[in-house]
Amino acid sequence: MELVQVLKRGLQQITGHGGLRGYLRVFFRTNDAKVGTLVGEDKYGNKYYEDNKQFFGRHRWVVYTTEMNGKNTFWDVDGSMVPPEWHRWLHSMTDDPPTTKPLTARKFIWTNHKFNMTGTPEQYVPYSTTRKKIQEWIPPSTPYK
């Protein structure tokens, strides 16, 4: 009887993603193919799911959109693509998703969510007011003879 339930759950995972093609697309993109109830969608197109049959910490997840802020994110997904209103629900800080209880407006929360810019030319580099302990060596410029 347990084998039947395992096969039934596997069939639900394949049909829950729109057939074999959709299942393989989700599996290769996220390395996981969970099926749950759709809780909501943010303004960027990310979809948020919940399945309380999973253990705590894996019972809520996001399926990222393929395009966000003009950037193709099909294979290049990043955890910073989750806006702050969904972050608190996704990490179990609250049981109420933003679809039922909207986030209160704060002046430090951006209206347009930004990616993590670490490792890009747009990254934040703070200005240092202290002298360096080690100075770069600049060779003397002498003309060739």
UniProtKB/Swiss-Prot annotation:
Keyword Iron assigned: no
Cell compartments where the protein resides: Mitochondrion inner membrane
Pfam families in the record: NDUFA12 (PF05071)
Main location group: mitochondrion
Record membrane topology: Peripheral membrane protein
GO biological process annotation, one example: mitochondrial ATP synthesis coupled electron transport
Keywords tagged on the record: Acetylation, Electron transport, Membrane, Mitochondrion, Mitochondrion inner membrane, Respiratory chain, Transport
Presence of the UniProt keyword Cell division in the record: no
InterPro entries in the cross-refs: NDUFA12
Modified residues (N-acetylmethionine): 1
Any one GO cellular component localisation term in the record: respiratory chain complex I
Oligomer status and interactors: Complex I is composed of 45 different subunits.
Function: Accessory subunit of the mitochondrial membrane respiratory chain NADH dehydrogenase (Complex I), that is believed not to be involved in catalysis. Complex I functions in the transfer of electrons from NADH to the respiratory chain. The immediate electron acceptor for the enzyme is believed to be ubiquinone.
Similarity section: Belongs to the complex I NDUFA12 subunit family.
PANTHER family: NADH DEHYDROGENASE [UBIQUINONE] 1 ALPHA SUBCOMPLEX SUBUNIT 12, NADH-UBIQUINONE OXIDOREDUCTASE SUBUNIT B17.2
Protein name according to UniProt: NADH dehydrogenase [ubiquinone] 1 alpha subcomplex subunit 12
Species per Swiss-Prot/TrEMBL record: Gorilla gorilla gorilla (Western lowland gorilla)
